[in-house]
């Protein structure tokens, strides 16, 4: 079994038992590694060094700032179901498509393989809120379906790449080229 000794001063357990005050007085940094049967058994620490270590531990346990953040900043509010307004309405932040949106989109000729993501919905809502146009709920859903169809097809059906990722070179040599 390997072990790491955290001090340059090493002493056998017999020497420590025989005269512990002298051993600790000679210890550099106030700490001695005590060995028994050629293996580290424990550390002996002077009272002064122990007080320093406890003060350091207490200092590190305190927060680095006096500012305490409110717990409610970390909790997302639960979305309450919002009734769909009757007639035409402008887009609002809590708008949601119907539960059977994918089926309805198929009826409108838009085949969606996956449900709308929160990012796609947030982008759609933000755009149409800024426009300020008014439509019926079904018309909003049709616009969302069309937006998803165009947005997802723009990249060949693949999700958009993260611009922050580092690309990896392809190590294969195409046919007709020499390596």
Curated annotation (Swiss-Prot):
Region (Disordered): 156-179
CC annotations in GO: primosome complex
Keyword DNA-binding: yes
Biological processes per GO annotation: DNA replication, synthesis of primer
Domain of life the protein comes from: Bacteria
Alphabetical UniProt keywords: DNA replication, DNA-binding, Primosome
Record's keyword annotation contains DNA damage: no
Stored Pfam families: DnaT
InterPro entries xrefs: DnaT, DnaT_DNA_bind
Sequence similarity: Belongs to the DnaT family.
Subunit structure: Homooligomerizes. Interacts with PriB. Component of the replication restart primosome. Primosome assembly occurs via a 'hand-off' mechanism. PriA binds to replication forks, subsequently PriB then DnaT bind; DnaT then displaces ssDNA to generate the helicase loading substrate.
Protein's job: Involved in the restart of stalled replication forks, which reloads the replicative helicase on sites other than the origin of replication. Can function in multiple replication restart pathways. Displaces ssDNA from a PriB-ssDNA complex. Probably forms a spiral filament on ssDNA.
Name recorded for this polypeptide: Replication restart protein DnaT
Protein's organism: Shigella dysenteriae serotype 1 (strain Sd197)
Upper taxonomic lineage: Bacteria, Pseudomonadati, Pseudomonadota, Gammaproteobacteria, Enterobacterales
Primary gene name: dnaT
